[in-house]
């Protein structure tokens, strides 16, 4: 069937061409019928590598499409647009004669085909697989493709002859029309799963969609830096290829960091240069002065000579013992604090100095130093504070005199309790604080009783700024520096303990102070103290005593009678004495009272004792921990002891904190009948009142008339 069809088509094409044929074209048209069977195998072997390359890089074009490529290509003068050839047109299996004729007759057409094919840019299936499938499904297309193959071999080559006439163009147009119709018939047998012709330009393949999605993800801009991963990887690869470092995979992270750092740029929109010094470097620069040796600036040589040898405590030794107890600040920070305390003792006339502890804050922390000035050194500062208070009181009195007189109020405010003098009670020691070692030390003001009373009713976190306001209810009289000083006084009074017998009262001053104020407020070290066994300090709380005075409910360590009056007032009110004005004197726990007498907190002991090590008890130390003030610790090795606090400065409370209830409303002015409002009378009451008044008037008139009559009778 194939052999009969192809000569017939060949004959029809020869008749259409007519006179355009040349003598040598007839030979090429007739010779393949007899010469090809002998040379088909060598030609196929020669064509194999070329067709294999073409199938990988171009569409699976059938011989039919190859025959019309010169007509529909860009070189054709008559065609304005390419022929509507399907990119996935099914290819039929050509006869053994077709490959040979294709190589002999149309080598330039294959070149044109390969030049047009890459413009599509769409992957296509293997032409061998497609042709095998179509050979099974559409056998009737084989004859058509073979016929077109013979036509392709018999067509004249105008580019070889260099001549084109009208008849040749007409024949080409007819052949093109015939091929188009034949392609439409062949396209109708397409598989439904294959995409439509020209669909690659409208609907991209799944591979292209995946690539586009991946690239879009890499191009996603970061919300923090404003860069994307695609550009970052491109810059990294460019840097690696330009520099070509050894073992690039090992320094890949460093290269990434260098590329990111290259994008950083300074801001030039500021009027002044920005200070890029970090707080860590700033404090490091200040701490350099702590490590300098020699004479400090602003310190007299005479003052250095007068400083006592025992003014500076051995903080590192105390830190060594607290480290065994599992408490401390670390060696580095402790040594910096040690140097900061040395700077404090070198610049102030301090007789005794002690590292009190560290109070934590929200923004910054407080390092607290407890000092005691030498005799007569702190009097000038106390006098300046008293002068400032008197000045404030004088200004307030002057303002009161200038104001208009108002109705006198019967409310009497409670008398302000004065603060304790320096070196006594809650103001026995002076406290310096700083936020970091190396920063300047700031002296805290003395505490007043009202601040301690209000501090017991509120609970505030420290910020680390001494000038920060304290917003609370009840209102606190002062800022954060006053609140810090009040909390330090409370913590010291409740947690500073020592082994029993380490301190003793003075023999001479003890009786006088006890008679005068009802208690002793001073003590001294016992030179005959031989120490207590560590195991005894752990087993019994009676071997620990308080060596700081207890603070009374009025905010003082020594009782102050707020009802004391002047002699004139006492003489005037001797006749009218009221028992309600009498307030019983409050007496706190005396000094050196054992801590075993401390009250429990809802069945929780106020103190917890333990050994620093149960594995080596013969070298362990006794550790005492406060449950009332979390963060307060004390240690003792039998002869030495030390107290230390690190915490937020809050007292333990079993219940959640609740602000106090506002006090009841006081009666500001007395209410009498002259200002008391009465209800309006009713009509009946008004009538009864008028009748009563009329009756009274009538009775008065009758009495007057009777008196007049009696007088007239007397004259007669």
Swiss-Prot record:
Q: Spell out the Pfam families in the cross-references.
A: Radial_spoke
Which residue intervals make up region (Disordered)?
A: 1-164, 375-410, 506-526, 697-716
- Membrane-crossing residue ranges in chain numbering: none
Q: Which residues carry this modification: Phosphoserine?
A: 396
One of the protein's GO biological processes: radial spoke assembly
One term under GO cellular component: radial spoke head
Q: What is its main location?
A: cytoplasm
Q: In which tissues is it expressed?
A: Expressed in trachea, lungs, and testes. Very strong expression is detected in nasal brushings.
Compositionally skewed regions (Polar residues) per UniProt: 140-156
The alphabetized UniProt keywords are: Cell projection, Ciliopathy, Cilium, Cilium biogenesis/degradation, Cytoplasm, Cytoskeleton, Disease variant, Kartagener syndrome, Phosphoprotein, Primary ciliary dyskinesia
Q: Give the Low complexity compositional bias ranges.
A: 29-42, 54-66, 80-100
Write out the biased-composition intervals (Acidic residues): 375-389, 506-516, 701-716
* Listed InterPro entries: Radial_spoke (IPR006802)
Any idea where this protein resides? Answer: Cytoplasm, Cytoskeleton, Cilium axoneme; Cell projection, Cilium
| Bias (Basic and acidic residues) | 8-25
Q: What does this chain do?
A: Component of the axonemal radial spoke head which plays an important role in ciliary motility. Essential for triplet radial spokes (RS1, RS2 and RS3) head assembly in the motile cilia.
Disease the record associates with this protein: Ciliary dyskinesia, primary, 11: A disorder characterized by abnormalities of motile cilia. Respiratory infections leading to chronic inflammation and bronchiectasis are recurrent, due to defects in the respiratory cilia; reduced fertility is often observed in male patients due to abnormalities of sperm tails. Half of the patients exhibit situs inversus, due to dysfunction of monocilia at the embryonic node and randomization of left-right body asymmetry. Primary ciliary dyskinesia associated with situs inversus is referred to as Kartagener syndrome.
Assembly information from the UniProt record: Interacts with RSPH6A.
Which PANTHER family did the record assign? Answer: RADIAL SPOKE HEAD PROTEIN 4 HOMOLOG A, RADIAL SPOKEHEAD-RELATED
Similarity annotation = Belongs to the flagellar radial spoke RSP4/6 family.
Q: What is this protein called?
A: Radial spoke head protein 4 homolog A
């Amino acid at each position: 069937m194939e052999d009969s069809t192809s000569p017939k088509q060949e004959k029809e094409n020869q008749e259409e061409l007519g006179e355009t044929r040349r003598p040598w074209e007839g030979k090429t048209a007739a010779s393949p019928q007899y010469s090809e069977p002998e040379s088909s195998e060598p030609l196929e072997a020669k064509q194999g590598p070329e067709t294999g390359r073409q199938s990988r890089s171009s569409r699976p074009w059938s011989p039919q499409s190859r025959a019309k490529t010169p007509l529909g290509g860009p070189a054709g003068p008559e065609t304005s647009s390419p022929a509507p050839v399907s990119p996935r047109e099914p290819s039929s299996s050509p006869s053994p004669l077709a490959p040979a004729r294709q190589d002999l007759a149309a080598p330039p057409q294959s070149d044109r085909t390969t030049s047009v094919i890459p413009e599509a840019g769409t992957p296509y299936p293997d032409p061998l697989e497609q042709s095998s499938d179509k050979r099974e499904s559409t056998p009737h297309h084989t004859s058509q493709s073979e016929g077109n193959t013979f036509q392709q071999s018999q067509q004249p080559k105008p580019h070889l002859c260099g001549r084109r006439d009208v008849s040749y163009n007409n024949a080409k147009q007819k052949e093109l029309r015939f091929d188009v119709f034949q392609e439409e018939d062949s396209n109708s047998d397409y598989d439904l799963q294959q995409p439509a012709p020209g669909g690659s330009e409208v609907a991209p393949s799944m591979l292209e969609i995946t690539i586009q999605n991946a690239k879009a993800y890499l191009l996603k801009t970061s919300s923090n830096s404003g860069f994307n991963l695609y550009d970052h990887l491109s810059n990294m690869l460019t840097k690696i290829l330009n520099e070509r470092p050894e073992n690039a995979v090992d320094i890949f992270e460093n290269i990434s960091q260098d590329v990111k750092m290259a994008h950083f740029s300074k801001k030039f929109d500021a009027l002044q240069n920005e200070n890029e010094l970090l707080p860590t470097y700033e404090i490091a620069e200040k701490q350099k002065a702590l490590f300098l040796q020699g004479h400090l600036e602003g310190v007299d040589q005479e003052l250095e000579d007068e400083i006592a040898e025992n003014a500076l405590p051995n903080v590192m030794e105390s830190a060594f013992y607290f480290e065994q107890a599992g408490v401390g600040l670390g060696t580095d920070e402790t040594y910096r604090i040690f140097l900061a305390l040395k700077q404090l003792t070198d610049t102030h006339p301090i007789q005794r100095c002690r590292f009190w502890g560290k109070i934590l804050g929200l923004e910054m922390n407080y390092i607290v130093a407890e000092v005691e000035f030498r005799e007569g050194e702190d009097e000038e500062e106390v006098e300046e504070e008293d002068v400032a208070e008197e000045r404030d009181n004088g200004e307030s009195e002057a303002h009161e005199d200038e104001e208009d007189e108002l109705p006198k109020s019967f409310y009497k405010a409670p008398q302000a309790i004065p603060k304790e003098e320096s070196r006594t009670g809650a103001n026995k020691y002076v406290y310096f604080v700083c936020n970091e070692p190396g920063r300047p030390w700031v002296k805290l003001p003395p505490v007043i009783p009202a601040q301690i009373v209000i501090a017991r009713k509120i609970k505030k976190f420290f910020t680390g700024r001494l000038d920060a306001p304290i917003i609370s209810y009840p209102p606190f009289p002062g800022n954060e520096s006053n609140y810090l000083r009040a909390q330090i006084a409370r913590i010291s009074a409740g947690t500073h303990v020592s082994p029993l017998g380490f301190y003793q009262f003075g023999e001479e001053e003890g009786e006088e102070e006890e008679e005068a104020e009802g208690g002793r407020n001073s003590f001294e070290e016992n030179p005959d103290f031989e120490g207590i066994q560590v195991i005894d300090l752990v087993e019994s709380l009676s071997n620990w005593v308080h060596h700081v005075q207890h603070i009374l409910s009025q905010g003082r360590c020594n009782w102050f009678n707020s009802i004391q009056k002047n002699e004139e007032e006492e003489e005037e009110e001797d006749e009218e004495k009221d028992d309600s004005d009498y307030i019983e004197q409050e007496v706190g726990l005396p000094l050196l009272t054992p801590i075993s007498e401390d009250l429990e907190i809802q069945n929780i002991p106020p103190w917890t004792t333990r050994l620093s090590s149960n594995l080596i008890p013969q070298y362990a130390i006794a550790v005492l921990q406060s449950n009332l003030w979390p963060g307060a610790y004390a240690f003792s090795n039998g002869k030495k002891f030390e107290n230390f606090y690190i915490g937020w400065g809050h007292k333990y409370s079993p219940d959640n904190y609740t602000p106090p209830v506002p006090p009841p409303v006081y009666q500001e002015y007395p209410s009498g009948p002259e200002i008391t409002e009465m209800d309006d009378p009713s009509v009946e009451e008004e009538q009864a009142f008028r009748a009563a008044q009329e009756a009274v008037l009538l009775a008065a008139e009758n009495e007057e008339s009777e008196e007049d009559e009696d007088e007239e009778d007397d004259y007669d």
